[in-house]
A protein has these predicted regions:
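OB-fold and OB-like single-stranded nucleic-acid-recognition modules
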Residues: 28-128
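Detector for intrinsically disordered, low-structure N-terminal pre-sequences
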Residues: 6, 22-25, 38
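N-terminal secretory signal peptides that target proteins for export/translocation
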Residues: 1-10
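Bacterial N-terminal signal peptides
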Residues: 14-24
Length: 128
């Protein structure tokens, strides 16, 4: 019986170590306000010229299909928008495509990619 408990304890220890390692892959979220242009993330990553009014129709089509949208800062950082603000195929974000916005939310990083999880009321348009 003691040996069975020892195996069970080792299993619990191993499970705990695995869980801790997985948590370490995602940096802890911190609340920030991010300012930049609202873009269709996939198109922007393919070609940095896919911004502004000339790309707005394409970005809107992709956004309505549920493609991730992102804020691109003046320094070139890309923050994928997640959470309630991006719900319902980006409904709350679409009117602001190709505009400069500020979004406040929980910023995290996973495998080098930045994400901002934001509530529906956390977006502010600051420029066209």
């Amino acid at each position: 019986m003691e040996e069975a408990n020892g195996v069970l304890s080792m299993g619990r220890i191993a499970s705990g170590l695995i869980a801790a390692a997985l948590v370490g892959c995602v940096a802890a979220a911190r609340t920030e306000t991010v300012k930049g242009e609202l873009v269709d993330q996939a198109c922007y990553i393919k070609d940095k010229k896919n911004v502004g009014g000339s790309h707005k129709d394409c970005a809107e089509t992709c956004a309505r299909r549920g493609q991730p949208l992102a804020v691109v800062t003046a320094g070139g950082k890309i923050y994928q928008i997640t959470g309630p603000l991006a719900a319902d195929n980006n409904t709350k974000l679409i009117p602001h495509l190709a505009h400069t916005v500020e979004i406040t939310g929980d910023v995290s990083e996973k495998d080098g990619a930045l994400m901002i999880a934001a509530e529906a009321g956390s977006l502010k348009m600051v420029g066209r």
